[in-house]
From Swiss-Prot:
Keywords: ATP-binding, Chaperone, Cytoplasm, Isomerase, Nucleotide-binding. InterPro entries: Chaperonin_Cpn60_CS, Cpn60/GroEL, Cpn60/GroEL/TCP-1, GroEL-like_apical_dom_sf, GROEL-like_equatorial_sf, TCP-1-like_intermed_sf. This is Chaperonin GroEL. ATP binds at residues 29-32, 50, 86-90, 414, 477-479, 493. Its main location: cytoplasm.
Length: 543
């Protein structure tokens, strides 16, 4: 297929047109008075959202060169969302502002490579300044404030996330689901939960809730399949003498072994249940070891020279309560020693620090969360499906922003921190490198200007007033139209969100500015399909 090749200024101008169209669509969602964007769906009702990355994902332009420009900035939004969970609109607005200003200078004769070098240097300096002016999140109130801002000033969402984080801890798992009612709910699962349910419904003890409940149970952990009952008999006889319930967690239990366990349960000989071990391969072995440490038990492993026949009461773990439904097993208050659990947590944290695989890191973080805290489930309620999806987007954003704030600290919000950090940087650059640095410093005003503009205020006046004021916490509250102490007003942003948004925006804008040619496919206009001939006369004898 023939290709269309465009060079230098023509190429960059066409790319800019695409970036501008994307930015104009996304920027209206910014700030407490940001507007909604209505998105047509291929089926069902249209979606309505104020989530920048959701809007960006839907933008596809007809012109192929423009679409390439938009696609690169979409990548900024997606990458920022992946890394920080929020700040997608900020990243898009920054990327557009840097590209626009840079394009003007390069068209006037500046060297793109020197300009890029200056942009990279000032970006590193501003990031260092942001970290310097940040402060750690100290209490529940600040967590609620971060979540509220990210959820478009919805205080109920902020409180919900703060409550969830208070209950499960900073490393705990918090998930977001759709509620069955119009009310928001927070359910906390204390202890450890993994995604394996009972192997047979005959193990159920609570028919109304369709779940197994074991009080003060013992826990047998085995890393292979159990098919032969003979191997299990010695430990089962010992458990029966204690009169306590037993949970068996193994790779699988099948055939004669499972059938005999079910019969013993139904006859009341032994209160017993069985589930498959979570995970696969080496990860399964690691998770079994996690459960052993949590419950104070030992994994029976043939690799360590242990057989199932050799298992004794001393090898079994203990817990206050275990709940099992068809999908999940929850261990409440395991009897493991706190020092052992802490050592295991530290070991997993060390593995997270050295792994280079995103997938491995995610799985290690799941294990860390299961060991170090419970699981909080936020159920989002709304009157309609459209409202539900929009609200769930905001809760996801707020949750990600809150985790980012806990991780790296907070700065004043509303775009003011970027301006203050930019003003504090003193660079000694010359020539086109200085032009690159100045481009970024001017672009740092763009988020605040956009927030003010969306709220109906004079963007230039507001941005200038914030810039010239020397108070570190001075900023503009667009919700009420006043200049305030941003920390006292609770208008704060995670420093990670600001940092990632700026770094990604500078990265993609500098790529666009150093582009000298574009190669794209030439779209061929296909002839329209011929009309079907008239069948005439309708369907004759049909009534």
């Amino acid at each position: 297929m023939a290709k269309d090749i465009i060079f230098s200024d023509d190429a960059r101008n066409r790319l800019y047109d695409g970036v501008k169209k994307l930015n104009d669509t996304v920027k209206v969602t910014m700030g407490p008075r940001g507007r909604n964007v209505l998105i047509q769906k291929s089926f069902g009702a249209p979606a309505i959202t104020k989530d920048g990355v959701s809007v960006a994902k839907e933008v596809e332009l007809k012109d192929t060169i423009e679409n390439m420009g938009a696609a690169l900035v979409k990548e900024v939004a997606n990458k920022t969302n992946d890394q920080a969970g929020d700040g997608t609109t900020t990243a898009t607005v920054l990327a557009h502002a840097i590209f626009k200003e840079g394009l003007r200078n390069i068209t006037a004769g500046a060297n793109p490579i020197e300009v890029k070098r200056g942009m990279d240097k000032i970006c590193a300096d501003v990031v260092a300044e942001l970290k310097k002016i940040s402060k750690p999140v100290k209490d529940k109130k600040e967590i609620a404030q971060v979540a509220t801002i990210s959820a478009n000033s919805d205080e109920s969402i902020g409180k919900l996330i703060a409550d969830a984080m208070e209950k499960v801890g900073k490393d705990g798992v918090i998930t977001v689901e759709e509620a069955k009612s119009i009310n928001d709910e927070l359910n906390v699962v204390e202890g450890m939960q993994f995604d394996r349910g009972y192997l047979s419904p005959y193990f159920i003890t609570d028919a109304e809730k369709m779940q197994v409940e074991l009080n003060s149970p013992l826990v047998l952990l085995f890393d292979k399949k159990i098919t032969n009952l003979k191997d299990l008999l010695p430990v089962l006889e010992q458990v029966q003498k204690t009169g306590k319930p037993l949970l068996i967690i193994a790779e699988d239990i099948e055939g004669e072994a499972l059938a005999t366990l079910v019969v013993n349960k139904l006859r009341g000989v032994l209160n017993i249940s069985a589930v498959k071990a979570p995970g696969f391969g080496d990860r399964r072995k690691a998770m079994l070891e996690d459960i052993a440490i949590l419950t104070g038990g030992t994994v029976i492993s043939e690799e360590l020279g242990r057989t199932l026949e050799s298992a004794s009461i001393a090898d079994l773990g203990k817990a206050e309560r275990i709940l099992i439904d068809k999908d999940n097993t929850t261990i409440v208050n395991g009897a493991g020693k706190k020092d052992d659990i802490k050592a295991r947590v530290d070991q997993i944290k060390a593995q997270i620090a050295v792994t280079s695989s995103d997938y491995d890191r995610e799985k290690l973080q799941e294990r860390l969360a299961k060991l170090s805290g419970g699981v909080a489930v936020i159920k989002v309620g709304a009157a309609t499906e459209t409202e539900m999806k929009e609200k769930k987007d905001r809760v996801d954003d707020a949750l990600s922003a809150t985790k980012a704030a806990v991780e790296e600290g907070i700065v004043i919000g509303g775009g003011a921190a970027l301006i203050k950090a930019g003003n504090a940087v003193k660079e000694n650059l010359k020539g086109d490198e200085k032009i690159g640095a100045d481009i970024v410093k001017r672009a740092l005003f763009a988020p605040l200007r956009q927030i003010a503009e969306n709220a109906g205020f004079d963007a230039g006046v507001i941005a200038n007033a914030v810039s010239i004021n020397k108070e570190k916490a001075y900023g503009f509250d667009a919700a009420c139209g006043e200049f305030v102490n941003m920390f006292e007003a609770g208008i704060i942003d995670p420093v990670k969100v600001e940092r990632v948004a700026l770094q990604n925006a500078v990265s993609v804008a500098s790529l666009l500015l150093t582009t000298e040619a574009t190669v794209s496919e030439i779209k061929e206009d296909k002839p329209a399909m011929p009309q079907m001939p008239d069948m005439g006369g309708g369907m004759g004898g049909m009534m």
